[in-house]
């Protein structure tokens, strides 16, 4: 049987709906366009095009993996973030829209009139570090992660976005081997409580690196480790911004104050949830 673009998209939408995928039509279009190596507009312009057997088999393999919980971004190998393109894979957390809000806040607080040093703790695929380097031409950035696999992915993303000359990548357990002081520190640390991980959606629980999501007991252990020696790495006037989990705002704000930060505040994301803690060094 020949399958046209229209027919296979309609069938896949139903298949994805049955699997509990939230945007079944959109994801079907994205995966089909990726499998055919065309953009989504091409699908609308050629709805009656028949797929070859090779194209059908390639698409079938992709939708079966998506139905089984493999993240869409892993299947297509990239994601858009803050207007840039990033390669993603199993070695690093898939960036979320909330982290774009974190970067937006960081850019708003960054000095522009002089050269500055920025620190991204737990860089993962490098989306924060690369975005800071791309939109702060006066900045040099240090990107830290404990995972060598994540750092390699981040290096590749720095190269593809043309900022590898201004980012230093460092393998470290938070600040343990980091030296010097910084003007801007940004982090999206693991903040999911360890006791809740088994209840996460399968695409997160089974396909995202545990190192990037497991925040330990209560989701606070990694954040506590991150903030413990923070004050020794800040220039006067430095801004610190962390992404946090729901219900963690006041506890993280208290850790900021213990680290000597002032002007500490908790801010909400676009959905109204407490998502960011921000402070400054005297």
Where are these regions (language model features)?
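Mobile active-site "lid"/loop adjacent to the S-adenosyl-L-methionine
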Residues: 191-222
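Conserved AdoMet
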Residues: 30-108
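Conserved hydrophobic residues forming the short capping helix/wall of the S-adenosyl-L-methionine
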Residues: 16, 110, 158, 230, ...
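Helix-to-beta-strand junctions that scaffold the AdoMet/dcAdoMet cofactor pocket
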Residues: 163, 208, 234-236
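Non-catalytic accessory regions of SAM-dependent methyltransferases
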Residues: 1-38, 42-44, 51
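Conserved SAM/SAH cofactor-binding pocket of Class I
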Residues: 97-199, 225
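Conserved Class I SAM-dependent methyltransferase catalytic core
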Residues: 217-280
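Residue-level signal for inorganic ion chemistry
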Residues: 31, 69, 99, 128, ...
């Amino acid at each position: 049987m020949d399958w046209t673009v229209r027919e296979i998209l309609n069938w896949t939408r139903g298949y994805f709906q049955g699997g509990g995928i939230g945007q079944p039509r959109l994801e079907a279009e994205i995966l089909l366009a990726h499998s055919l190596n065309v953009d989504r507009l091409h699908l609308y312009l050629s709805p009656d095009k028949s797929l070859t057997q090779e194209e059908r088999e390639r698409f079938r393999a992709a939708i079966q993996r998506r139905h089984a919980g493999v993240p869409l971004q892993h299947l297509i190998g990239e994601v858009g973030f803050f207007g840039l393109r990033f390669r993603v894979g199993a070695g690093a957390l898939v960036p979320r829209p909330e982290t774009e809000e974190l970067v937006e806040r960081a850019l708003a607080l960054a000095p522009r009139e002089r050269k500055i040093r920025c620190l991204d703790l737990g860089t993962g695929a490098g989306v924060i570090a690369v975005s800071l380097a791309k939109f702060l031409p006066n900045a040099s950035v240090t990107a830290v992660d404990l995972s060598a696999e994540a750092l390699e992915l981040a290096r590749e993303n720095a190269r593809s976005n043309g900022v590898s000359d201004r980012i230093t990548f460092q393998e470290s357990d938070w600040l343990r081997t980091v030296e010097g002081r910084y003007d801007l520190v940004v982090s999206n640390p693991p903040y999911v409580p360890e006791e809740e991980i088994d209840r996460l959606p399968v695409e997160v629980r089974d396909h995202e690196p545990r190192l990037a999501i497991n925040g330990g007991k209560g989701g606070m252990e990694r954040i506590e480790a991150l903030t413990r020696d923070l004050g020794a790495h800040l220039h006067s006037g430095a801004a610190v911004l962390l992404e946090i989990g729901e219900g963690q705002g006041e506890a993280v704000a208290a850790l900021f104050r213990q680290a000597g930060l002032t002007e500490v505040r908790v801010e909400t994301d676009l959905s109204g949830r407490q998502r960011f803690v921000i402070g400054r060094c005297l």
